[in-house]
């Protein structure tokens, strides 16, 4: 059941499961302006037998309030607000972020290093330069998405949408890129049910926000880190995860064969098993 909590002036939608006294895992979803907590909560709730799993929609996303500002820094501070509310002011948590959520997870683990015991990153990148790799990958896979284009990726997905409807339509036509086994009917239903907020997307891709770069700060991360990526990840190609794992002290890289950006869904049992093993070390 979805519940709501006020954090830093915003009403944030969340789900939580698992024993109240267990270590808290906060999952961070991807998708600037279009993501929500539901997929991650479903994917990672099997860990709820031993951990408390908290998944939430960022401000301006999903069922959470459209409370500005929509910035990386504000969302990172909201994450810490959720940590303090559900774990306690002095408690460490496990941060699990994928894609855009992985960007936020890195920023959180740098800014609030003492608040993170373990960091799990999925299909993400250490800087905005992943966009160059995504464009090259799309050039090779355009046959999978005949209604999508390089221009749409550059100018819309990595730029700005004119409306929520345009956002929804572009996301539908690009959906086959995300998984190695695409279900068109499920993709249509997902796009119909999903909330698209062009304003929050555009703010988070604005000139002030889009040029994030953690490459020089990854060494400041002290959490025990696992980096998971599918070998076919199109939008955050594996070289990004390899770089992160190399720069964070004692980080472990888990490269999953025949999996794409949605590796945690495509290879759910394998990924959950690996996360459990990492947390039990």
UniProtKB/Swiss-Prot annotation:
What GO biological process term is on the record, naming one? proteolysis
What superkingdom heads the lineage?
A: Eukaryota
Q: What happens when the gene is disrupted?
A: Does not affect the production of scytalone.
The record's annotation in Pfam families points to: Abhydrolase_1 (PF00561)
Q: Name one GO cellular component term.
A: membrane
What Enzyme Commission number(s) apply to this enzyme?
3.4.11.5
Q: Which GO molecular function terms does the record list?
A: aminopeptidase activity
Query: Which reaction does this enzyme catalyse, per its entry?
Result: Release of N-terminal proline from a peptide
Domain called AB hydrolase-1: residue spans: 23-267
Keywords, ordered alphabetically? Aminopeptidase, Hydrolase, Melanin biosynthesis, Protease
Family, as annotated: Belongs to the peptidase S33 family.
Q: What does this protein do?
A: Proline iminopeptidase; part of the gene cluster that mediates the biosynthesis of dihydroxynaphthalene (DHN)-melanin, a bluish-green pigment forming a dark layer in the conidial wall that protects the conidia from UV radiations. The first step of the pathway is the production of the pentaketide 1,3,6,8-tetrahydroxynaphthalene (1,3,6,8-THN or T4HN) by the polyketide synthase PfmaE though condensation of acetyl-CoA with malonyl-CoA. T4HN is not stable and easily oxidizes into the stable form flaviolin. T4HN is also substrate of the hydroxynaphthalene reductase PfmaG to yield scytalone.
Could you identify this protein by its name? Proline iminopeptidase PfmaB
> Which species does the entry assign this protein to?
Pestalotiopsis fici (strain W106-1 / CGMCC3.15140)
Q: Which gene encodes it?
A: PfmaB
């Amino acid at each position: 059941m979805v519940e709501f909590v006020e954090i830093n002036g915003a009403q944030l939608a969340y789900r939580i499961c698992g024993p109240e006294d267990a270590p808290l895992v906060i999952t961070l979803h991807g998708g600037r302006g279009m993501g929500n907590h539901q997929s991650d909560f479903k994917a990672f709730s099997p860990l709820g037998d031993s951990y408390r799993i908290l998944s939430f929609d960022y401000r301006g996303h999903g069922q959470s309030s459209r409370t500005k500002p929509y910035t990386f820094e504000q969302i990172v501070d909201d994450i810490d607000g959720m940590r303090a509310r559900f774990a306690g002011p002095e408690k460490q948590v496990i941060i699990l972020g994928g894609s855009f959520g992985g960007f936020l997870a890195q920023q959180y683990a740098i800014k609030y290093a003492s608040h993170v015991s373990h960091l799990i990153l999925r299909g993400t990148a250490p800087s905005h330069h992943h966009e160059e790799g995504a464009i090259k990958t799309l050039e090779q896979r355009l046959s999978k998405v005949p209604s999508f284009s390089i221009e749409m990726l550059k100018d819309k997905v990595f730029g700005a949408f004119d409306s929520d409807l345009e956002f929804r339509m572009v996301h539908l036509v690009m959906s086959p890129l995300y998984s190695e086994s695409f279900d068109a009917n499920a993709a249509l239903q997902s796009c119909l049910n999903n909330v698209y907020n062009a304003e929050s997307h555009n703010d988070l891709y604005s000139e002030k926000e889009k040029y994030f770069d953690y490459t020089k700060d990854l060494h400041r991360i002290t959490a025990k880190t696992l980096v998971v990526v599918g070998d076919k990840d199109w939008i955050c190609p594996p070289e990004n995860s390899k770089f992160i794992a190399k720069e964070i002290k004692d980080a472990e890289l888990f490269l999953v064969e025949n999996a794409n950006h949605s590796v945690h869904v495509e290879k759910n049992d394998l990924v959950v098993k690996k996360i459990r093993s990492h947390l039990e070390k």
